[in-house]
Amino acid sequence: MLRRQMSFNGKSDMGILYLVPTPIGNLEDMTFRAIDTLKSVDAIAAEDTRQTKKLCHVYEIETPLVSYHEHNKESSGHKIIEWLKSGKNIALVSDAGLPTISDPGAEIVKDFTDIGGYVVPLPGANAALTALIASGIVPQPFFFYGFLNRQKKEKKKELEALKKRQETIIFYEAPHRLKETLSAMAEILGDREIAVTRELTKKYEEFIRGTISEVIGWANEDQIRGEFCLVVEGSNNEEVDEEEQWWETLTAKEHVEHYISKGATSKEAIKKAAVDRNVPKREVYDAYHIKQ
């Protein structure tokens, strides 16, 4: 069903859900409009009320806070929707940056817009775009991915799915997983250009620019602290063409043997070769085992 929202000229019996960005490190990045909105709404739904309370104290915001995070989003979200339906205005904030981006909030936005509610976004701080524009890597087109899976095996699967994308790719990463993630990127994406940023907008803001292998060298020698944003160069046409054609001169048997030489079992190698060739595994299996 089509739903039209005239944010400032429309009429609605329900309240408005405001999506209010908060600073990603430097408190001076809080906008006048964000402060005014947080002061004027009936309640602030916060990912971490303790963190938001500190922000409110700085700007003398006395609006009541309600907890809304990943572990209570269903129960708290239902309560917030009921408040909105009754005509109350609610502001949604995350700990830092824009709500719903690698943070809870997308569900409540969908639920409220599905019933015709007005959702008004405010512009403001965002770590991904802040890192991108200063990365030195082509800023557009870009693809924002956020956090990779914490499990090493699943992380590699995700990178495999991303390796042919030609857009600049933006990731978030925690300090204790940075080295493992960089190693997985080097293995799967190759030695591309990358900009690693940490402590954006804070006193110790830092950019580390270079190839993935160079950044791995830095990570092995430096102390890893802070929250990281990684801006990675996309694939180029030559890389894609080379990847698609490298095996074309090989027989199916030689193709399987190539993967076995890289450490794969015969079963894994047959599966990989079948995927490359876009043929049934049985066809590759038969070709590999002939005359053996």
From Swiss-Prot:
It is found in: Cytoplasm. One of its GO terms (cellular component) is cytoplasm. Its EC number is 2.1.1.198. SUPFAM superfamilies: Tetrapyrrole methylase. Its main location: cytoplasm. Keywords: Cytoplasm, Methyltransferase, rRNA processing, S-adenosyl-L-methionine, Transferase. It catalyses: cytidine(1402) in 16S rRNA + S-adenosyl-L-methionine = 2'-O-methylcytidine(1402) in 16S rRNA + S-adenosyl-L-homocysteine + H(+). One of its GO terms (molecular function) is rRNA (cytosine-2'-O-)-methyltransferase activity. HAMAP family: 16SrRNA_methyltr_I. Belongs to the methyltransferase superfamily. RsmI family. This is Ribosomal RNA small subunit methyltransferase I. It comes from Bacillus subtilis (strain 168). The lineage of its organism: Bacteria, Bacillati, Bacillota, Bacilli, Bacillales.
